[in-house]
Amino acid sequence: MIGDQKINHVSRALLLAPFIFVCHFLEESPRFVEWFNAHVVRGITSGLFWRVNISALAITLIVVGIEWVSRSAFSLSLAIVWLSFLMLANAIFHIGGGFVDKKYVPGLATAVLLYVPYYSWVFMKAVKSERVKIMELVVAAVLGSILMLIHGYLILFRGSRLF
């Protein structure tokens, strides 16, 4: 019974992920494309920005659904991989962008106020669930975040992008 409660707590916590993502999207959407295109040679369109974010929301809903139905080591690891890409690395990107630009960048407020605390909370719930070993969760977080971290580095410091 205690194991089921631990599993259920992390599953319930993940239900907030789509809402937190939408809050972040709403904050960054009015000015992100303009900000992004000021940093890279190969810019993006508003349409691409919307498609990427709608796809990210769909993936988030699928990942949360898989966790809710499965509640397995795989589903929890998948959730950590995805949230590490979507929230952890994205938050680092927005915070880094704020330091590089020395001013507010679109998405910075929700990255700091929602993404960082929410991701930390979910990660700790995942650890406490004891469903996946902590080292495996750390590896999942690194693997999930690496592409977005490289992408962010290229944008902020090289004027290019990975995808």
Where are these regions (language model features)?
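Membrane-interface helix-boundary motifs at transmembrane edges
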Residues: 4-8, 67-77, 126-136
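N-terminal signal-anchor transmembrane alpha helix
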Residues: 7-27
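Hydrophobic cores of alpha-helical transmembrane segments in multi-pass inner/ER membrane proteins
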Residues: 16-17, 56-63, 113-124
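Core segments of transmembrane alpha-helices
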Residues: 53-70, 87-91
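Membrane-interface helix caps and helix-loop-helix hairpins in membrane proteins
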Residues: 73, 95-106
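Terminal transmembrane helical module of multi-pass membrane proteins
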Residues: 121-163
